[in-house]
Amino acid sequence: MATKFPKFSQDLAQDPTTRRIWYAMAMGNDFESHDGMTEENLYQKIFATHFGHLAIIFLWASSLLFHVAWQGNFEQWIKDPLHVRPIAHAIWDPHFGKPAIEAFTQAGANGPVNIAYSGVYHWWYTIGMRTNTELYTGSVFLLLFASLFLFAGWLHLQPKFRPSLAWFKSAESRLNHHLAGLFGVSSLAWAGHLIHVAIPESRGQHVGWDNFLTTAPHPAGLQPFFTGNWGVYAQNPDTAGHIFSTSQGSGTAILTFLGGFHPQTESLWLTDIAHHHLAIAVLFIVAGHMYRTNFGIGHSIKEMMNAKTFFGKPVEGPFNMPHQGIYDTYNNSLHFQLGWHLACLGVVTSWVAQHMYSLPSYAFIAKDYTTQAALYTHHQYIAIFLMVGAFAHGAIFLVRDYDPEQNKGNVLERVLQHKEAIISHLSWVSLFLGFHTLGLYVHNDVVVAFGTPEKQILIEPVFAQFIQAAHGKVLYGLDTLLSNPDSVAYTAYPNYANVWLPGWLDAINSGTNSLFLTIGPGDFLVHHAIALGLHTTTLILVKGALDARGSKLMPDKKDFGYAFPCDGPGRGGTCDISAWDSFYLSLFWALNTVGWVTFYWHWKHLGIWQGNVAQFNENSTYLMGWFRDYLWANSAQLINGYNPYGVNNLSVWAWMFLFGHLVWATGFMFLISWRGYWQELIETLVWAHERTPIANLIRWKDKPVALSIVQARVVGLAHFTVGYVLTYAAFLIASTAGKFG
């Protein structure tokens, strides 16, 4: 007899109901719970999946290069990047009639195509790509790389090539390898590519596989490097009149510290970027030699964590906080590690979103407004999922892996002991932010509706304006630090009366970029609305994690695992309080918050791009302004994507907008009606099926049963999330592309 799905759990495989399928899907990635799983096998499986993950990433990148080279217009786009729309790929659809074919034949193509809003054209152009042949070459190289990684994944599952558990637990070796090998050497390699290929190409000098070994990136060669005269590499930078990809106005410098933007491309100077990556490489290669491995030299992380002295002075531990036992706790819990990694990656992803538009590093991307909007929104959405995931795995760690004995008296136990104070402070700040921010918005709404807008309560963000002024923004007249030519920040060593980054002050005071945008009362209000969302999301997640092991209401909570619906009907108050429930609830708040973040960013930028900042400034101070002048006004083109007169090139976004709403609304069916309703419905359908001629010839092996409450919630949450993302993505791209192409 064939073994039934799932193979990883005999208990589930023998379940006579449809639970077998749903629980198997839920537990598929929970390797720890699989039959016969050992700790060593767990690490080996996860290690092998990393290779598969990398293979998928390389395959994806390869497919982008391949489709653009095959069906795109890269070579045409290069000639006029400000006006030619980049093509992602062709579309073939048997449903297209003549009007649709005409609508989607755009950007100089011969047939229907999709426009690229990912920024890959700008990226490839900046790093030195110039021809379709180069794109094809890159595509084939990445395809081979992906194959290599797939093979490596398979190889590391073979008995002879499976690393031992001790190898996985060697934290210092892994840290050295990741710091020096991955971060350090890859940054050095990237600096090398920029210096040897990208910078010469930006100056009109071709560097390819045919001549890269014979073309020196700097006229002085390596002599300044070996003689310690490194300043030579910064002399003679590109001039303000440099035309990108030509020799006109170009210099010879390869490592500079100019600051600001290239006047024509409005992106960071390539020579500054190369300098940055070289510095990162040096730092990380040094950092990758700091930890003690086989040679008995360097730091032992365990000793540092357990230390009670700091340069001879007695302390509680690192940062004068007791970290005893943390090393083993961290090193023996994959969930603890994953929680940290997701938290760090989440912060970095949000940080990337903020920097991609304010300090654009790719040529001309600052003027591709739809791409800017898409990239910002994409990275902020990714960030919230990573952050919520961090708390989820932190809670799983506390339920499954936390050992109270091992962590006696250290910072982990200290946080758990102070959980009431932490949770109540988060609650207080959420209530304060919520009532005050909503109160201000509603007050302003009412007075505007009554025809007395001058009675609005408008608060200038003076502290934020002060910070901007300190960085050199002179508009506010606050005369402090870099905005005051007589201050020590302005006149400081090494170059008196000449700011360290000559291009910085020009950039921060230019009205045409997104660096340190001018802010006022509308920004003050939406900032606090976003702060409310962030603090409430954090409250739900922190409470869920800190109460995951037990609460006053349910002291034995940890015995029920990470996700459970209730402890039976006889124990009141135990429903909806598992750590999983806090993850589930927090995601609604996280989505809510990222909505406000992206609404704010998009509306503010639409005004800047259209040269009409007054609309945001005047109408963002009351709720109706947001509803009417941002959401309603910008959905007009979207709703008109197709109408009785035919279709236009926004119609695909109009359909996606509708479809997104449909998916989103479907979520509520699972979120509002729970198990009893569905069980009755299923029983009725089964009864009808069994009594219907012909239909009753078909039977099923599994008895149909309704989803559990937790499963229904996850299905509802998935629909809510996917619908939310699709709806806003369509709105964002159509409303921006409809205005700017």
Swiss-Prot record:
Which residues are [4Fe-4S] cluster-binding? C566, C575
The record lists phylloquinone as bound by W678
Q: What is its EC number?
A: 1.97.1.12
| Residue spans crossing the bilayer | 46-69, 135-158, 175-199, 273-291, 334-357, 373-399, 421-443, 524-542, 582-603, 650-672, 714-734
GO cellular component, alphabetical, reads: photosystem I; plasma membrane-derived thylakoid membrane
What InterPro entries would the database entry show?
A: PSI_PsaA/B, PSI_PsaA/B_CS, PSI_PsaA/B_sf, PSI_PsaB
The residues the record assigns to binding chlorophyll a B3 are M669, Y677
How cofactor binds (record note)?
PSI electron transfer chain: 5 chlorophyll a, 1 chlorophyll a', 2 phylloquinones and 3 4Fe-4S clusters. PSI core antenna: 90 chlorophyll a, 22 carotenoids, 3 phospholipids and 1 galactolipid. P700 is a chlorophyll a/chlorophyll a' dimer, A0 is one or more chlorophyll a, A1 is one or both phylloquinones and FX is a shared 4Fe-4S iron-sulfur center.
Pfam entry (one):
PsaA_PsaB
Q: Where in the cell is it found?
A: Cellular thylakoid membrane
Example of a GO MF term: oxidoreductase activity
Q: What is its main location?
A: membrane
Residue sites binding chlorophyll a B1 per the record: H661
The catalysed reaction is:
reduced [plastocyanin] + hnu + oxidized [2Fe-2S]-[ferredoxin] = oxidized [plastocyanin] + reduced [2Fe-2S]-[ferredoxin]
Q: Which domain of life is it from?
A: Bacteria
This chain's function reads: PsaA and PsaB bind P700, the primary electron donor of photosystem I (PSI), as well as the electron acceptors A0, A1 and FX. PSI is a plastocyanin/cytochrome c6-ferredoxin oxidoreductase, converting photonic excitation into a charge separation, which transfers an electron from the donor P700 chlorophyll pair to the spectroscopically characterized acceptors A0, A1, FX, FA and FB in turn. Oxidized P700 is reduced on the lumenal side of the thylakoid membrane by plastocyanin or cytochrome c6.
The subunit structure is: The PsaA/B heterodimer binds the P700 chlorophyll special pair and subsequent electron acceptors. PSI consists of a core antenna complex that captures photons, and an electron transfer chain that converts photonic excitation into a charge separation. The cyanobacterial PSI reaction center is composed of one copy each of PsaA,B,C,D,E,F,I,J,K,L,M and X, and forms trimeric complexes.
Protein name as catalogued: Photosystem I P700 chlorophyll a apoprotein A2 1
Q: Which organism is it from?
A: Trichormus variabilis (strain ATCC 29413 / PCC 7937)
